Amino acid sequence: MKPLSSPLQQYWQTVVERLPEPLAEKSLSAQAKSVLTFSDFVQDSVIAHPEWLTELESQSPQADEWQHYAAWLQEALSNVSDEAGLMRELRLFRRRIMVRIAWAQTLALVTEESILQQLSHLAETLIVAARDWLYDACCREWGTPCNAQGEAQPLLILGMGKLGGGELNFSSDIDLIFAWPEHGCTQGGRRELDNAQFFTRMGQRLIKVLDQPTQDGFVYRVDMRLRPFGESGPLVLSFAALEDYYQEQGRDWERYAMVKARIMGDSEGVYANELRAMLRPFVFRRYIDFSVIQSLRNMKGMIAREVRRRGLTDNIKLGAGGIREIEFIVQVFQLIRGGREPSLQSRSLLPTLSAIAALHLLSENDAEQLRVAYLFLRRLENLLQSINDEQTQTLPSDELNRARLAWAMDFADWPQLTGALTAHMTNVRRVFNELIGDDESETQEESLSEQWRELWQDALQEDDTTPVLAHLSEDDRKQVLTLIADFRKELDKRTIGPRGRQVLDHLMPHLLSDVCAREDAAVTLSRITALLVGIVTRTTYLELLSEFRAALKHLISLCAASPMIASQLARYPLLLDELLDPNTLYQPTATDAYRDELRQYLLRVPEDDEEQQLEALRQFKQAQLLRIAAADIAGTLPVMKVSDHLTWLAEAMIDAVVQQAWVQMVARYGKPNHLNDREGRGFAVVGYGKLGGWELGYSSDLDLIFLHDCPMDAMTDGEREIDGRQFYLRLAQRIMHLFSTRTSSGILYEVDARLRPSGAAGMLVTSAEAFADYQKNEAWTWEHQALVRARVVYGDPQLTAHFDAVRREIMTLPREGKTLQTEVREMREKMRAHLGNKHRNRFDIKADEGGITDIEFITQYLVLRYAHEKPKLTRWSDNVRILELLAQNDIMEEQEAMALTRAYTTLRDELHHLALQELPGHVPEDCFTAERELVRASWQKWLVEE
């Protein structure tokens, strides 16, 4: 064993001072001194449990002792009689065995492969023991879940990721998916439960037993987000539901995740074999699957963006050439050829890597370099985490931990360790780039005229610029030169560094060559230099634009087309990553896929890190907004589709925000107990206005109200018990907070909740019964108008159906035509007096006479006036489809409805384009005269004439 280095010998004296008397220095072996000096986790553990150190000294850890874990744990659990005792024994057992593993790892008593096997088997042993104990307890309490034939149904657990692959790291989350075979009911209990209820309750208890921190710590952090539908999906699914999901909706990333899935415990039982056979066709295609290559290229880009986003320069997992890239290389071959080559279907990385080499898919040299790098990186990762039992892959910056790692990795000092690390990661990165390179060969850098370089470096006199700027007017030439000079002055005020300056000197001649070829060169350059000023100290982004000429061209064209986009990119340069792939830049996410895309995006963020969750939500929204705007500018999205995309995006954000707020509130207070015997959360979010009407614009706020169906006597079931209705009030407040909190990426949305009953004076969240009563007995006509454009944008089916019924009932009430006409007209006149005619010789597209609001009032009036006779008018909440319904139900002539629809979409289209130009929503008075005249005539017909 290598002696401790000088810094560690000095630190040993600090350790000695902490040790209790029974662990006196003279009684400790050299091995014990080394491990206690290296790991604070081991040190703290043996101080609390001195008998563990005695055991370690007398029974040194062995490579095959994982075979005894189950028996040792069974003995520890033999006298456990309740859940609290189970939680305590599981935590103590995990800590005791982790100390033994840390001891063996620090002293290199066993191979790194053995360490990974022991860590994974320990986790599996603890998970299975907890499951089996709880299954028996739940069966005693609720009866045994059975299928239609009366056969007992088990809970099967899929271990995902490194747990499934038998490669768990020292301090790790565990990713699980729960499933049961067949539907049925419990037998032998006090009352019958269906299997879904039984396994959901049991699953919740299992997560609590493993995950909940106590005075003894926790067993593992449990992550269930890889299950179908993520956090919004059922906690446990039947085999049939799993099969339907993966056949109909399984995404590429879920295929990648399922490669490593392994059934915990009895993996050879009948049900285990059935589940495995069901999943195999989804993961491994029977044909050679080259369709996956583009997805893998996209994932490569995601990795690179993740590294840039989080500044992961010292991260041995996610950094360039890190563990993630080795895993990715291996998965490439598994997913492309695994259906044809059974040897590639292993869950574990090293056997699969050997199979790849045997099939000559990689050279022997590359495969060996990857194997050696993987074992080096995994040992370094596990040693790093075992210092404090901390989930980290970032290299330390302090001298003590650097000295610890250098010693344990068998290097003389830190520089020698980092030198070897760099060599390994360079090898990995080379193979990674060769394997997942772009399908187009990189073109040679275009030769640039020396004049563009001179223009950037201020080596040209004004007269000399004529040849390169000949197509520009004299004023524009002067403006371009002034912009370049001002930009250089701004650079002098900033600390860029030699590398940043070098990249900028390479980038700017290309940029000027492309920009100055345009007729609008001066305007475009002014927008781009404003953006560059914000990123010149962040060399990564300059390199992105310098190395990817296509990204630079997209930047120029988008900034030329829209100052709004230029401003967004300047405020949030992370969005520059979106310029790399034109396939996604100009092709927004499918309208029904925003929720799934967001769920995948959030998987990268720790669930308990609220700050990162808030940032991720905002970053996702901004990236999607950029794609929608780019497609709008390119003309690939008509105005109706722009609003559809903006609305679906907002609904995905609402879904995620409610989910986060719910998790936080339930962790604090538990759930309202009226939910124990029903599905859903008893909560709904109703969208009004532009959100309700599928008509959001780029900068629209969200008009929301919150509903619940909680009984008066309900309480929460957590340790901090509160009134159920108080829970929903705090939930709504939390949702508002998550939307409005300003982070470095701004706010998510402005939210206006004043359309709730009694407005700002009313409760933030309203019971469904109170909402119905208010609408029937207290609401004004304008509130019924607002209800025309209202719909549930988040909520369980029960509450959604209730709201829809109330809305339909209110809208179909018989109304006296003249009275309604007067009330609607007078409300519009008040609004026009307050909001319209504010700009002399200008037409406010929304607020002035003949504008958008007049069309909205016409449709609302006609729905309220005629829905009693034609209930089908209540079906839709958007103006365009309401106009269709009015024509279909013979209330409005088809020609008039089509003309109003054209006027409405034309005016909305102009508002979108004004927003892209960062211009206010008014135009010269002589614009849209035909549309305005048409709207005035319709207004006169319906709301003035008797």
From Swiss-Prot:
Protein name per its UniProtKB record: Bifunctional glutamine synthetase adenylyltransferase/adenylyl-removing enzyme
Glycosyltransferase listed as a keyword: no
A biological-process GO annotation: regulation of glutamine family amino acid metabolic process
Requisite cofactors: Mg(2+)
A Pfam entry, by short name: GlnD_UR_UTase
Keywords per UniProt: ATP-binding, Magnesium, Multifunctional enzyme, Nucleotide-binding, Nucleotidyltransferase, Transferase
HAMAP family with a match to the protein in the record: GlnE
Annotated stretches, region: Adenylyl transferase: 449-946
Enzyme Commission designation: 2.7.7.89, 2.7.7.42
Cellular compartments per GO CC: cytosol
Stretches of the chain forming a coiled coil according to its record: none
InterPro entries referenced in this protein's UniProt entry, alphabetically: GlnE (IPR023057), GlnE_rpt_dom (IPR005190), NT_sf (IPR043519), PII_UdlTrfase/GS_AdlTrfase (IPR013546)
Organism domain of life: Bacteria
Annotated region described as Adenylyl removase, given as residue ranges: 1-440
GO molecular function, one term: magnesium ion binding
Catalyzed reactions: [glutamine synthetase]-O(4)-(5'-adenylyl)-L-tyrosine + phosphate = [glutamine synthetase]-L-tyrosine + ADP; [glutamine synthetase]-L-tyrosine + ATP = [glutamine synthetase]-O(4)-(5'-adenylyl)-L-tyrosine + diphosphate
Family: Belongs to the GlnE family.
Protein purpose: Involved in the regulation of glutamine synthetase GlnA, a key enzyme in the process to assimilate ammonia. When cellular nitrogen levels are high, the C-terminal adenylyl transferase (AT) inactivates GlnA by covalent transfer of an adenylyl group from ATP to specific tyrosine residue of GlnA, thus reducing its activity. Conversely, when nitrogen levels are low, the N-terminal adenylyl removase (AR) activates GlnA by removing the adenylyl group by phosphorolysis, increasing its activity.
